[in-house]
Amino acid sequence: MTIRLVTFDLDNTLWHVDTVIRRAEKETHNWIQPRVPEYASYMTTENVASLRARVMEENPGIRHDVSALRIQMMRRAFEQCGLRRTEADAKAREAFAVFIRWRNTITFYDGAQDTLSTLSNRYQLAALTNGNADVQKVGLDSYFSFAISAADVGSSKPSPEMFLEAMHRAEVSPDHAVHVGDHPIDDIEGANRVGMHSIWVNFDGKTDRVPADATVTDLPSLVGAIATLEDS
């Protein structure tokens, strides 16, 4: 068996996303505070949940577009804080520019770039993400032939659209493709459902029984794991 395409999840597979998001939100709030002082007190946990639900109900098309969702939530919050719609929209987009800059400021897991470099010399690589990280802005565009987000296909993993689109672009069948990711459902089950091979990245040594073709506990081990799949 020959593997021709290796697709990668990004968040929590190549870097720890919770740290990234917390810092991005902190920097965004720091930017907003002197410009819209009422924002911090308005954005309670209850209001955020209500705002998210309302925005998604009114804009079902952005359910899988986390960037558009965040912008619209900030716009609505700014309106609730007293800004006119046009001003709220402009401020939301400015605030999002701050957020996304920090969203794409990441620290890679050990061995991530070296592993991608090695694999990109052997296979076509693609990034598949439910989030809004940008492979060019994080400095991985030299390794990936292309990247697909949930916003691009209007559907999030584990739904099949992203996996199928990747194989279509790479012109490969499922038996020549493998997906790498940390999430047992979004990544592993999603890939399995479309017939792709799957490798579970289990950094924490979880004991869950995940139906992946292989499991690794560090990224450098992917090179050998994929080679073993080819030999099977």
Give short role names for the model-derived ranges:
Residues 2-110:
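N-terminal helical cap/lid subdomain that shapes the substrate entry/recognition surface
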Residues 1-6, 17-18, 34, 41, ...:
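Asp-based, Mg2+/Mn2+-dependent phosphohydrolase catalytic module
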